[in-house]
Amino acid sequence: MPTVDLKILDARLADQQPAYATPGSAGLDLRAAIDAETEIRPGETRLIPTGIALHLEDPRYAAMILPRSGLGHKHGIVLGNLVGLIDSDYQGQVFVSVWNRGHETFRLAPLDRIAQMVIVPVVQVDFRVVDDFTSSSRGSGGFGSTGRQ
């Protein structure tokens, strides 16, 4: 299993580091490293610190920040940028852009789990400019061109 350098920037997280909840978990929960409960009103976005910094270092990996399904479904709390992407050479604190798309004010308490992080492989490519593509059965059809059923 690859290793990633992790800095704990908030001492409260020393015993609550990102960890996989089950052997089959893809994501690691990120927590709100805030000092007091904060309210996020409907339609509002907030940048929430996680209290950790990481350095993936290896350009074959990136980290994706994704919403937690329960927060989105039950409370309308999703990511303000929909998906966060952390490049392998980033070394700063991880922040989560939290957006309340719901109709009720959401109260976020210190150390609440607010998002999940998934480490993913990355393939960097070189582009070759061409005049035409080799034909495929799909061609340039998009936005529903393959049907609904």
Swiss-Prot record:
Cofactor(s) listed in the protein's UniProt record: Mg(2+)
GO biological process, one term: dUMP biosynthetic process
Keywords recorded for this protein, A-Z: Hydrolase, Magnesium, Metal-binding, Nucleotide metabolism
UniProt pathway annotation: Pyrimidine metabolism; dUMP biosynthesis; dUMP from dCTP (dUTP route): step 2/2
GO terms for MF: dUTP diphosphatase activity; magnesium ion binding
Binding site for substrate: 68-70, 81, 85-87
Record InterPro entries: dUTPase, dUTPase-like, dUTPase-like_sf, dUTPase_trimeric
Keyword Metal-binding: yes
Superkingdom of origin organism: Bacteria
Known catalytic reactions: dUTP + H2O = dUMP + diphosphate + H(+)
UniProt-listed Enzyme Commission number(s): 3.6.1.23
Function: This enzyme is involved in nucleotide metabolism: it produces dUMP, the immediate precursor of thymidine nucleotides and it decreases the intracellular concentration of dUTP so that uracil cannot be incorporated into DNA.
Similarity comment: family membership: Belongs to the dUTPase family.
Descriptive protein name: Deoxyuridine 5'-triphosphate nucleotidohydrolase
Organism: Laribacter hongkongensis (strain HLHK9)
Lineage: Bacteria, Pseudomonadati, Pseudomonadota, Betaproteobacteria, Neisseriales
